[in-house]
Each structure stands twice: as structure tokens, then as C-alpha cells.
Curated annotation (Swiss-Prot):
This is Large ribosomal subunit protein uL14. The keyword Nucleotide-binding does not apply. It comes from Karelsulcia muelleri (strain GWSS) (Sulcia muelleri). GO terms for cellular component: cytosolic large ribosomal subunit. Pfam families: Ribosomal_L14. HAMAP family: Ribosomal_uL14.
Length: 120
């Protein structure tokens, strides 16, 4: 459960390390796994294609807040993380770092699921 001004890790190799959540798209107050958000880069690797202060769309792939699955089980992660997207909706990076949630497959982010090292 992420809200405006939340700081989030970046789970891809785009060059950004940490972002600030500016807006949750879709008229919602909080962002959960699979939601699209607008972020500002707060910390980036020197020499990368992304620079501090740039705005990007992103999709949430991990949250500390536990989410309930249809079978009644719950899942939560150790950190809040997102993957940066381009203006066309494609992934900015080429690799996904860390585990991602299975719920992304239901929300049509199959490329993120296929590139992830671990799907929980």
C-alpha cells in the first residue's frame, strides 16, 4: 500500500535506485501490486540513461503490505519496489531484480513476470 510521497526501490537495471511516488493513476488513493504510478527519480547510478528529477511511469511489483490471494493465503515482501516504464508502456530496463508477485500475470504484465528471477 503506497501513497503519494512514498519512496520506492527500483527493481530493474534502468539505472535508477530510488524513486518518489508522485501520483497513483486510476483515481485511487493507494497503490498496490500491479498498479501504474507516476514517479520522480531521486537516486540514480552515474552515467545511466535516467537522471535525477526525471518523471516516469512505473508499475508496482512488491509491497510490504500483505495482499490476500483467492485461495485465502497472504503474501508480503521485505520492501516496496517498482519497475520503470517508457511513455509507450514498455519496460525501461532489460532485467528484473528480485522476486515479483504472481498477480502481475493477471494484470497483463507478462513481460515483467517472464524476466523475473523468481515469481511468488
Amino acid at each position: 500500500m503506497l501513497q503519494q510521497e512514498s519512496r520506492i526501490r527500483v527493481a530493474d537495471n534502468s539505472g535508477a535506485k530510488e524513486v518518489l511516488l508522485i501520483r497513483v493513476l486510476g483515481g485511487k488513493k493507494y497503490a498496490y501490486i500491479g498498479d501504474t504510478i507516476i514517479v520522480s527519480i531521486k537516486e540514480a547510478i552515474a552515467g545511466s540513461s535516467v537522471k535525477k528529477g526525471q518523471l516516469y511511469k512505473a508499475v508496482v511489483v512488491r509491497t510490504k503490505k500483505k495482499i490476500r490471494r483467492k485461495d485465502g493465503s497472504y503474501i508480503r515482501f521485505d520492501d516496496n519496489a517498482c519497475v520503470l516504464l517508457t511513455n509507450t508502456g514498455e519496460m525501461k530496463g532489460t532485467r528484473i531484480l528480485g522476486p515479483v508477485s504472481r498477480e502481475l500475470r493477471d494484470k497483463e504484465y507478462t513481460k515483467i513476470v517472464s524476466l523475473a528471477t523468481e515469481v511468488l
